[in-house]
Amino acid sequence: MDFNLNDEQELFVAGIRELMASENWEAYFAECDRDSVYPERFVKALADMGIDSLLIPEEHGGLEAGFVTVAAVWMELGRLGAPTYVLYQLPGGFNTFLREGTQEQIDKIMAFQGTGKQMWNSAITEPGAGSDVGSLKTTYTRKNGKVYLNGSKCFITSSAYTPYIVVMARDGASPDKPIYTEWFVDMSKPGIKVNKLEKLGLRMDSCCEINFDDVELDEKDMFGREGNGFNRVKEEFDHERFLVALTNYGTAMCAFEDAARYANQRVQFGETIGRFQLIQEKFAHMAIKLNSMKNMLLEAAWKADNGTITSGDAAMCKYFCANAAFDVVDSAMQVLGGVGIAGNHRITRFWRDLRVDRVSGGSDEMQILTLGRAVLKQYR
């Protein structure tokens, strides 16, 4: 596998560098993080470059550039300090609707292409159904030609401001044999109550509880096929886990470079601290983890472009990168010392963000279970 960037990919990476150098984005990110606000102005700038169209097929006005290109862009954005976790719906969110949605649903979502605005997210997790997705209690019930949605969701990303949510629910008329179906829900409908939650990290993307009280839908609001809810979201889980891993790597690389620059200029005991062997040991271990993450992610991206990526690959990336990246950021914070914990350094934001990623998008434990099954399956 040759991971040298082609001309198109080099242009994207160069464009990212130019954008990130165009203004003090870090001040904007710090403000958005402090106020728990989605950085729409930044995402709009990326959309103007075509970043939200990287995976959209050419016949739908996209670039069809592939996952290796997505990886190159995400890695560079992260290295330069951008909160790529706010972009999870951009690479594949449009394609999900092109593949599964009705024409009306497709038109509503594709209208967001190029805008930088949040458009939709999935609502699966519930108070009693986290990793145990099969314990979902939210129901849809048909009555007098309408469909009524009842139940509660929690920890739903982007849901404070996104105009649409795809809700996983079980058929209320089939309690003994659960049928799980997704529904395309306009968040302005009566009966929906949203409660925004505070988070340790990833603050630029909202996290909410959502209650549905007899929310009236039509049959045309069904998303995909009835009873196919679980099968569809499995692919979405793999996609999300790969993107989370890319974000983890980029963030860790940024922290590593910040710490390296600091170590080479901070003087103690008459020498720069980078001359001390204990500090050098930290950088050696950080470099090993970063190199391992990068190679793993580029191989996974290549597999995705060639149609051979598996759920095991995605779980491996998510687990390893979430943990390795957190270790890198934690070590970088140790190098920075008081600057890292008492000042306004972005390392504190990185540390908070990466700790969340060992839970969100699938916990460490669920990634290990998924990966273990996938590994052994190859030898049956």
UniProtKB/Swiss-Prot annotation:
Keywords on record: Cytoplasm, FAD, Flavoprotein, Oxidoreductase
Pathway assigned to this chain's UniProt record: Amine and polyamine metabolism; carnitine metabolism
Gene3D superfamilies: Acyl-CoA dehydrogenase/oxidase, N-terminal domain, Butyryl-CoA Dehydrogenase, subunit A, domain 2, Butyryl-CoA Dehydrogenase, subunit A, domain 3
Pfam families: Acyl-CoA_dh_1 (PF00441), Acyl-CoA_dh_M (PF02770), Acyl-CoA_dh_N (PF02771)
Catalytic activity: 4-(trimethylamino)butanoyl-CoA + oxidized [electron-transfer flavoprotein] + H(+) = crotonobetainyl-CoA + reduced [electron-transfer flavoprotein]
Name of the molecule in the record: Crotonobetainyl-CoA reductase
GO molecular function, one term: acyl-CoA dehydrogenase activity
Subunit note: Homotetramer.
Keyword Transcription among UniProt keywords: no
Any one GO biological process: carnitine metabolic process
Organism: Citrobacter koseri (strain ATCC BAA-895 / CDC 4225-83 / SGSC4696)
CDD domains for the chain: ACAD
Family the entry assigns: Belongs to the acyl-CoA dehydrogenase family.
Cofactor annotation: FAD
Entry's localization field: Cytoplasm
Function, as annotated: Catalyzes the reduction of crotonobetainyl-CoA to gamma-butyrobetainyl-CoA.
EC number(s) on file: 1.3.8.13
Gene Ontology annotations for the cellular component aspect, listed alphabetically: cytoplasm
Cross-referenced InterPro entries: Acyl-CoA_DH_CS, Acyl-CoA_Oxase/DH_mid-dom, Acyl-CoA_Oxase/DH_mid-dom_sf, AcylCo_DH-like_C, AcylCo_DH/oxidase_C, AcylCoA_DH/ox_N, AcylCoA_DH/ox_N_sf, AcylCoA_DH/oxidase_NM_dom_sf
